[in-house]
UniProtKB/Swiss-Prot annotation:
Signal peptide: none annotated. InterPro entries: F-box/kelch-repeat_ARATH, Kelch-typ_b-propeller, Kelch_1. It comes from Arabidopsis thaliana (Mouse-ear cress). Disulfide bonds: none annotated. Transmembrane segments: none annotated. Residues 40-54 have a biased composition (Acidic residues). PANTHER family: F-BOX DOMAIN-CONTAINING PROTEIN, F-BOX/KELCH-REPEAT PROTEIN SKIP4. This is Putative F-box/kelch-repeat protein At2g29800. The keyword Repeat applies. Residues 20-35 have a biased composition (Basic and acidic residues). Kelch repeats lie at residues 163-211, 212-258, 263-302, 305-349. Pfam families: Kelch_FKB95. Residues 58-105 form the F-box domain. Keywords: Kelch repeat, Repeat.
Amino acid sequence: MASISETSDDGSNGGVPNQKPEEPHKNPQEEKENQNENPNEADEEDDHQDEEVENVPPIPRKIPPVLIENTIAPLRRCHYPKLSLLSNAFRQVISSEDLFQVRSLIGSTEPVLYTLITFKYPTFEEGRWFILQRRNNTSLKLNCVTSLPPMFLGCTAVTIGHKIYVVGGYNFRYNKTISTVLEIDCRFNTCRHLRNMKRDRCSAVAGVIDGRIYVVAGRQRRFDDWVEVFDVETERWELVPGPFSSFASSSGKFIVHVVLDNKIYIMDGDYCFAYDPRRRRWETWGPESAQRSYWHLSSCVVDDLLYAIVPREIFGASIVVYDPRGIAWRPVMGLEFWPNLVYFESKMANFGGKLVILGCYRSSFDYYRKDVWCVEVALEKHEDGQIWGKVESLSLVNAFPMSPFFELSRTVTI
């Protein structure tokens, strides 16, 4: 084993690094006699040191596949940054596509939440993607993904596997709605431009059905171009002709939407719609319908059930759940101790089967410093069909000097 000794610069050697301290003066005759007595001592010591160095195993230039599969791939991604510091070989493995293919094959993938945040007060800033990262087994942090460019206001996004597809928006520089499409590879946080949509769209609806991306509205309602579909394999767009609901907003801008039961559910003021791309059919429900009654902005789908945050005094619960087969809302039980966040400005997402809510204790219109909190809720379905929830964690994940607006929250699998 090779050892490294440290030398101190304490003035005994004149302040010159790595220079040995000056030894006491010796008689030249004594030095000569000492050298004659042990002529091979120095050579033996050098040979011994060389032998120790030779016994040190070399740093591998390539990590064996069996080591990748058994030790690196099963690790949580939060450990990869430290692992990459060990050697260039580890850095190459962690930045390779092969590692993520192995993670998928052995079932070690994990959900990763991306949130698009804009800042509108006191000054406007374009949206940036933030990633919710787990620093250890319990601690969470919301960090900006600086390698990704700012997003256009009014864009929408869907996820397929480890990719986020961002479509449309409004370009303030040129004062126009756009048809831009970006593909974000969340394994490496890189993006590329795809073929533009056939129409410019802002504040559109988007959903993935049968592996294809459907984009609805985002422009004036017209029969022939209100819907278009993107094939991710051929990277081609096609317009989908009507019909559409006559109750839908003519401006084509909607409040919130989700994919549920292979349909795209859309909330528009007093009305609720469902678009079935397979049959090209629309369903419409009025303000008194069960579908519209408790659906609010902060909502998401888990296991084909729609969850939404509501004022507690309405239903006696903080979160309600909608089953499209039973066409009924029910309270999520077990959430008596619930953080008092500003939920009409929060954003809920499906995080690997759990509910994750990002929000603040103060309104975004309050110009003071904003602390962003994350609530993790585990879900459990009992034998009687009742859904129970448990707050697993409440974490302060970031603080901003300006008011954050949570535009989108999307979960990918990496």
